[in-house]
Structure formats: structure tokens, C-alpha cells
Amino acid sequence: MKKKLLALICALALVFSLVRCTISAPDTVGSIGDFEITSGMYLLAQYGAYQQAAQLAGTDQDTTDVKAFLKETITTDSDSGETAVVSDYVAQKTQETLETLAAVDARFKALGGELTAEQLSTADRYAQQMMDQYGDTYTANGIGLETVKAYERLQVEHTALLDMVYGPDGETPVEDDELTSHLDDSMYEICYISIPLYNTSTYAFADDDQKAEMLKLAQAAADSVNAAGGETVSDQVSALHEAAQNALPDIYAVLDSETSDDSASVQTELLTESDVASAFTQDGAADALRSLSYGEAAAVQINGSTLLLMVRVDPLSVSSLDDLRSQILSDMKGGELDDALAAGGAELAHDLDSSAMNKLPAKKIVNNSANS
């Protein structure tokens, strides 16, 4: 009899344990507009908000101690000095993310959008890649593959909205001449060779005198590119490659370093103003790039560890306007679209279940990446 009673107590304990697990993980936390927010999507938004807060943490704040960090204060605007308690910041950013996702879904559907099989496959494939890479972290935070798939599909919808709103057949199309003007004035296509300002074997960094010598030699190479006067992008890239092959051995020798087989390989990239601001951090580097005309070469130290030997080229000599349209629209109108989506999401009817959200508190976030 005692054994049966014990078995019954154990069974009841298991049932109550399972009930508690079910209660602590609701299927949804409500909706914003017609967008139903699953618990997984809520947790993903909350985890992302926590990571945003972690990026703003001070060097003396430990973001792996989630409960403690949530009680601390971070500076949210370095210019104004505005601060926020982390828990409040995370709650605010979580809601803003969910509002934006709801607005993306609503706007996409309102414009008659429907993802193609290829778009769905691309989103799902990327979601699987994310799970393969970050699966342990996602799982620890209650985020599964289906949630990541749903999120990535919304990202595809968001990208598609740029064309649906601003494309040739969009609601408010941006004319080709506007795109071309933005491309000329605010984007920079460069063909470049990256030169490390350190010995590639010992990783000993160049001192100021060595950097000056390397820059002088690289600029002489750039001058030879300009003297060649190449009229086409192909001519300009060929001249750049030849100049690099001739100059790099002497440049590397400043640090007793040697070139490799691909040291003179030319790379091409179309940069936005945001890219320039984040990558060209050395004093005067960004302005040096902006001042270049199409076909003009220069040597520019872009940060403490990298020197570029580069030539600015006409993007429309490399790609057609149609090929560049989405990239230009993203740079030109991406911020405007995001602002509109954020405002639209905030205006949608909010039917959120506070009791459900309270069962998914930020204090349960697992964050093993210490703030650097």
C-alpha cells in the first residue's frame, strides 16, 4: 500500500511539473494587428533586445550575469548622455521589434505580397544555417528552428518591401535619375588592395615612421596608376594590379615581411556612407576617399592596421542600374522605410497578454558572451 501511495505521489508530482512547464511557456503572447506573436518570436525579440543592451554596456559591466545586468544603467545616447535601466531598455526594444515585424507583415500583405518558393527556400536555408551556428544559444533561450524560419521569412518580406514601395512599379517609385544621383554622390565603388600595417609573420605593428614610409611607397604606386590614364575600369584595374606587384615587395620589406601569392589581388566593393564611416576611421581617410574622381587612384591609411591602395571607379561601368537598384534603394530609402514601419507598427492594435509575457521574463535569458 505504501509503495502504491508513493507511486501516486510521484506521478502527481510529475503531472504538476509538466503543468508548470506548460504554463511557463505559453504558445503565444498575443498579437499586434493581425500578427500573432508566438512565445518563440517573443523570446527571439527579447534576446535581440538584450544583445543591443549588451553592446552599450560599460567595460565594468558583466552582461553574462543577466539578473544583475538587468538592474544596471546604460548610456543609450552618447551625444545627449541619455541613460536607461537595462530591464526597461530591453522591454522597450522587445516591443519595438515586435511592432516592426507586425508592420512588415501587414504592409507586405496589404501590397499583395506573396513569397515565392525560391524566397521561402532561401529564408529557410539561412534559418538552418543560423541554427547550425548558434543553435545551442537559441535552444538555451527557448528559440527553435521554426521561430528562426518565421523570422527570416519576415526579413525577406522586409527586403521585398523596398521594391514594392520604391521600385519602378512601387507605390512611390524612385526615378532612375534620383538613383544615379545618389550613387554618384553618396556611394563609392572602389577597386583596392589591402596592405597590412604589421609583419604578417610576427604580427609586430609598424611604428609611425614605418607607416609613413609604407604610405609614401604606396602613394608612389597610386601615382603610377594615375599616370597610366586608363579610360576603362578594366584598364584602371590592370594598372592598379601592375603597380601593386611592383611596389608591394618594397612596402612589405619596411617591416621585414614578405608578400604572398595573393598580396596583389584586387578586390571590388561598393561602399555606402555608413560603410565609409565605420571602416575609414583614421583621421582624414573618409574625406580622402570622397575626394577621389572616377578613375583616380590613391593610397589611404583607413585605420591603425590597414592601408589601401585603391582606385575609385564608376559603379555603372561595373554593373547596370537595374543590378544596383536594390542596393541603392536600401541605402537611399532603407531608413525612411524602417521609420515608417516602426511608426505603423506602433499604431496597430495591441492585444498583448501581460500574464503570458511575464512567464517569459528577461531574467531567464542565457547570455554566455561576456561584454568586450
Segments predicted by a language model, with ranges:
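N-terminal targeting/tethering segments
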Residues: 23-143
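Positively charged n-region of N-terminal signal peptides that target proteins for export
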Residues: 1-9
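A solvent-exposed, charged loop/short amphipathic helix patch at secondary-structure junctions
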Residues: 60-78, 201-223, 327
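Peptidyl-prolyl cis-trans isomerase
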Residues: 220-282, 323
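PPIase-associated folding chaperone regions across multiple families
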Residues: 23-25, 32, 138-216, 275-372
